[in-house]
């Protein structure tokens, strides 16, 4: 059996994990890559994606059952569930084995819960994926989603940097950090006052000391006047730790934007190794062609500040125009194919008529009207 590839989707509550999995499923279906979503959140009873080709942990155990049986709260119940699951993975093994037996090239997408302690302080989730990786030769990449609203506050931005760094160290897997819902960023305020720095400052994670004066002002504005300087010093030390590790950077994602998805998935495929010679085996030839043609060079030339903040409306209009043109081209192509098929059917009828005429002349009999 060849190596199995996949993504582990993590992130705080509300960061868009299930929405991302839904969009990813549609994207992979479009490029011909077989995939399966595995929901690991026992509290998520409203899945936006199709459950026909997915595995749902709620089919076996729900958080409500754990809470009632063990008299635990939501977070405690979730940790208990994963600790129990880590000790006995037999059923989980069998279900994944069934999926891979049906199609050994299936790409696995793990939709994880939003409780951050599972991937920052509790090692159970890491142990589960470690065992799965050994069992099925899994090549996984962690996709850490962060809501774009967090970069509008300097202190919240530092907190998500710490969260991302901690998850990278805890999960011990290749990790791509993503600022999700980037298209919503312009809705959070006037674009001239929305961010004190350009968007690429927040994605490249450099020169964090520039945030110190802003954090002091922010602390004073929310009523922490007497502790503002202490908070600023604490933030300075935390910023030094983040910069010393030099591990955290961010990509941006709009789930409805094709170019944004192509750019992100190319990076993820490089991180887990899928892109290196496996795409043909997986059958997603369209994706292979996109990569070979160097589409990423074109996408990387787009300035994210200009695309998502300065000139977002103009870019959106241009993308919509391209989308409508693509739909029109497809309709014309389908129409041409139908015409060719009809002509082929007509030619077949003419050929059949000639054959029957020759048979009648040779035998002196009248052929039936039915073929």
Q: Which residue ranges define each predicted feature?
A:
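Short, ordered loop/turn segments at secondary-structure junctions
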Residues: 40-43, 147-148, 180-183
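Short, basic, glycine/proline-bearing loop/turn elements
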Residues: 8, 145-152
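Arginine/glycine-rich "motif VI" loop of SF2 helicases in the C-terminal RecA-like domain
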Residues: 133-137, 166-173, 241-244
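Switch/connector loops and helix/strand junctions flanking conserved nucleotide-binding motifs
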Residues: 45-48, 117-120, 151-155, 184-195, ...
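Structural beta-sheet core signal
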Residues: 37, 142-144, 177
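Amphipathic helical hotspot of TIR/SEFIR-family domains
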Residues: 151-172
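P-loop NTP-binding site
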Residues: 1-30, 36, 97-103, 107-108, ...
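Nucleotide-state-sensitive switch-loop elements of NTP-binding domains
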Residues: 2-10, 15, 19-128, 133-139
């Amino acid at each position: 059996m060849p190596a199995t590839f996949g993504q582990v989707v993590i992130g705080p509550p509300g960061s868009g994990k299930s929405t991302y999995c839904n969009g990813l499923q549609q994207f992979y279906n479009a490029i011909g890559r077989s995939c399966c979503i595995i929901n690991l959140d026992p509290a998520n009873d409203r899945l936006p994606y199709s459950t026909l080709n997915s595995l749902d942990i709620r089919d076996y155990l729900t958080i409500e059952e754990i809470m009632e049986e063990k008299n635990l709260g939501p977070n405690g119940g979730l940790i208990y569930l994963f600790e129990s699951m880590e000790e006995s993975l037999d059923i989980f093994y069998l279900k994944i084995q069934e999926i891979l037996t049906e199609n050994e090239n299936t790409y696995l997408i793990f939709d994880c819960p939003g409780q951050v302690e599972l991937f920052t302080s509790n090692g159970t989730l890491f142990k589960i994926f470690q065992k799965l990786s050994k069992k099925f030769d899994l090549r996984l990449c962690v996709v850490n989603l962060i809501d774009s609203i967090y970069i509008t506050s300097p202190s919240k931005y530092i907190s998500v940097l710490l969260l991302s760094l901690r998850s990278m160290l805890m999960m011990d897997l290749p990790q791509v950090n993503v600022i999700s819902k980037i298209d919503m960023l312009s809705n959070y305020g006037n674009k001239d006052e929305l961010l004190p720095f350009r968007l690429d400052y927040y994605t490249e994670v450099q020169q964090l000391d520039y945030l110190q004066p802003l954090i002091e002002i922010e602390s004073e504005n929310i009523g922490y006047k007497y502790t503002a300087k202490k908070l600023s010093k604490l933030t300075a030390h935390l910023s030094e730790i983040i910069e010393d590790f030099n591990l955290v950077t961010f990509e941006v994602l709009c789930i409805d934007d094709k170019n944004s998805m192509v750019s992100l998935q190319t990076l993820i495929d490089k991180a887990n190794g899928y892109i290196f010679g496996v795409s043909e085996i997986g059958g997603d030839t369209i994706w292979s062609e996109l990569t070979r043609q160097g589409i990423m060079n074109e996408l990387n030339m787009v300035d994210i500040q200009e695309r998502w903040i300065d000139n977002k409306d103009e870019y959106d209009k241009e993308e919509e125009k391209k989308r409508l043109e693509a739909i029109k081209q497809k309709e014309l192509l389908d129409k041409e194919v139908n015409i060719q098929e009809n002509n082929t059917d007509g030619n077949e009828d003419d050929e059949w008529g000639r054959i029957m005429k020759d048979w009648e002349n040779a035998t002196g009999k009248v052929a039936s009207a039915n073929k």
